[in-house]
Regions:
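Phosphate-sensing "switch" segment of ASCE/P-loop ATPases
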Residues: 128-134, 143-215
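P-loop NTPase catalytic core of nucleic-acid-dependent motor ATPases
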Residues: 1-80, 201-204, 209-215
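Loop/turn-to-beta-strand initiation segments
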Residues: 82-85, 114-118, 133-139
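Conserved catalytic network of the ASCE P-loop NTPase/AAA+ motor domain
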Residues: 32-35, 76-81, 99, 112, ...
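Conserved AAA+/SF3 P-loop NTPase catalytic/coupling segment centered on the Walker-B
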Residues: 85-113, 143-152
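Conserved catalytic/switch belt of AAA+ P-loop NTPases
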Residues: 58, 62, 101-128
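Conserved RecA-like P-loop NTPase ATPase core
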Residues: 25, 57, 89, 106, ...
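Conserved alpha-helical scaffold flanking the Walker A/P-loop in AAA+ ATPase domains
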Residues: 68-85, 92-100, 104, 124-129
């Protein structure tokens, strides 16, 4: 059903991308069951529906939030608070040298325990270390390549311009709520089964590939 909705609102270059993106959306609801989670990268020139890809993820992925740039503190606080998908549009800005720190957090946080931010809070003269985690599903849209380490964690969805007319995925459409209800129901009824089969997935694959494709 998710694949059908994707085909109604976005035109991918390869037909298999519909299944990949649909599976990624479903997996976001189970990401706490996994040790690592792959990122999605919509890569292409202007007017290739990259941002639309993120908008659809924003409608369907778990507790998704879409941004066009953020500070380290805002990024980590958002992920730690929502425990959902973090979507970055115009992600070529991450290639700026001033964003080296936040790129490091993005690159590290594809695994559980990675990308943690610690701050010292002083209350009534007592020091307390607070820890915020940034492990979560993440997706990007950009015209240029991402940082090499960050790109290495991504499933790349190459986008091209198309003449095919597809309707805009407006946020008020009832289908988004219906699909999210189905996805939450799937999580509540199947999370134990997912935890059970996850350790045996990806056998025979190399380390990084196995990490990224096991979910």
């Amino acid at each position: 059903r998710i694949k059908t909705v994707l085909k109604e609102h976005i035109d991918f270059q390869k037909s298999e991308h519909y299944g990949t993106v649909a599976a990624w959306i479903i997996a976001t609801y189970f990401h706490r069951c996994f040790y690592a989670f792959p990122y999605l990268f919509f890569f292409g020139k202007k007017q290739t529906a990259k941002s639309r890809g993120l908008e659809i993820l924003e409608r369907l992925a778990l507790n998704a939030v879409k941004v066009k740039g953020t500070s380290v503190a805002s990024f980590v606080d958002t992920v730690d608070g929502l425990r959902g998908a973090f979507l970055t549009d115009q992600a070529e800005s991450l290639g700026d040298i001033k964003n080296t720190e936040i790129v490091g957090y993005h690159a590290d946080s594809y695994t559980v325990g990675g990308g943690k931010r610690r701050i010292v809070q002083i209350v009534n003269g007592a020091r307390k270390v607070l820890t915020f985690e940034s492990y979560s599903p993440k997706a990007y849209a950009a015209q240029k390549e991402l940082d090499e380490d960050l790109r290495d964690r991504c499933i790349i969805i190459s986008m091209i311009r198309t003449d095919k007319e597809v309707p805009y995925p407006a946020s008020h459409l009832l289908i988004w709520g219906e699909l999210r209800n189905d996805l939450y129901r799937l999580l509540l009824t199947q999370w134990q089964e997912v935890q059970k089969i996850y350790p045996d997935t990806g056998k025979g694959m190399s380390m990084r590939i196995r990490e990224l494709w096991r979910p």
